[in-house]
Amino acid sequence: DEPDGVPTRQKQ
């Protein structure tokens, strides 16, 4: 899980 702030993948 990527930390909120680094939009590497669109979280839906």
UniProtKB/Swiss-Prot annotation:
Gene Ontology cellular-component annotations: extracellular space
Subunit (UniProt): Hexamer.
Expression sites (tissue/organ): Hemolymph.
Name of the protein described by the UniProt record: Pseudohemocyanin
Task performed by this protein: Does not function as a hemocyanin.
Family according to the record: Belongs to the tyrosinase family. Hemocyanin subfamily.
